[in-house]
Amino acid sequence: MALNIYHEARGEPVVGQVAVAQSVLNRIADNRYPNTVCGVVKQAKYNPWDSVTPIRNQCQYSWFCDGKSDTPKDDKAMLEATIVAQFVLSGSSRDVTEGATHYHADYVYPYWADSLIPTIKIGSHIYYR
């Protein structure tokens, strides 16, 4: 969870980082998605002959299969993401996304956005359910 927060919401206000984490929990609660944090974050398309390496740019979270290193380079931001992850996973936060399972940066408009209901904009992300 912390690594996903780091890559998806680094530089966002804390509430934006909480929102990214909450959207993962919302997916876990939805039977259309895997039922674990790792399952949701690592959900991707794989070649039939390689079940280990996801197909590039075919992941739910782009950082997971963009071909770049996933190792955090900003220790302070990773610490903050870890604290946010612990807070959300402990059940201490409320769902600020209003049930969102999807989000995107406000400077793009993905093909799936028209098929979902927008719920809220937090930081530079727009959330949908």
Where are these regions (language model features)?
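Bacterial extracytoplasmic/cell-wall-associated proteins, especially those involved in peptidoglycan
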Residues: 1-129
